[in-house]
């Protein structure tokens, strides 16, 4: 029985298509298009007590902000307002504050993963507004020559040159966040995502 030339060519062609299909990446491996990328519209930056808006601008300029932005400091609802700085090796003040909170049944220290910040040889500990007005709390701080300070919160909005709202890719925002958090006057930077995905 003879196989016609056309059938042989067709079988060879199908074999090549099957082999090609086995050794190439499926469509599911194609990179996600850029329009599905997470977008960042701004950042909340927590500065040390006393940072002025001109100092904030200088810090941002030194970090080569490549997009236009506007700055809004200490307006609207911000996170924790007050903090104390405690030497990392000074366990006595932390122990006494903890005991005082238990005895007085008060929440002087705000505890969350974002409130205990290490800066150099100190911990930055967020404290409640209740604590700032509590004589017992203040007497413990006075005993250890520690003062209550106030965070300076600034919101950075990314903008187009005409002042309208803009965004940057998450990858760029994370890089910027990491660079900014290396600055001594900055305690934390949090990313503000745009929810239009």
UniProtKB/Swiss-Prot annotation:
Family statement: Belongs to the UPF0228 family.
Protein name: UPF0228 protein MA_3125
């Amino acid at each position: 029985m003879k196989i016609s030339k056309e059938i042989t060519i067709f079988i060879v062609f199908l074999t090549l298509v099957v082999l090609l299909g086995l050794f190439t990446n499926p469509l599911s491996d194609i990179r996600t298009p850029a329009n599905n990328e997470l977008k960042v519209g701004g950042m909340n930056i927590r500065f040390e007590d006393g940072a002025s808006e001109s100092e904030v601008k200088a810090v941002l300029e030194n970090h080569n902000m490549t997009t236009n932005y506007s700055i809004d400091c200490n307006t609207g609802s911000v996170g924790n307002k007050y903090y104390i700085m405690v030497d990392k090796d000074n366990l006595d003040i932390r122990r006494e504050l903890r005991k005082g909170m238990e005895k007085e049944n008060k929440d002087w220290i705000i505890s969350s993963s974002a409130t205990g910040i290490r800066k150099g040889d100190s911990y930055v500990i967020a404290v409640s507004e209740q604590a700032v007005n509590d004589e017992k709390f203040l007497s413990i701080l006075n005993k250890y020559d520690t003062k209550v300070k106030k965070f300076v919160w600034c919101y950075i909005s990314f903008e187009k040159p005409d002042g309208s709202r803009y965004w940057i890719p998450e990858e760029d925002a994370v890089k910027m966040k990491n660079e900014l958090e290396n600055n001594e006057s900055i305690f934390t930077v949090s990313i503000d995502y745009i929810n239009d995905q």
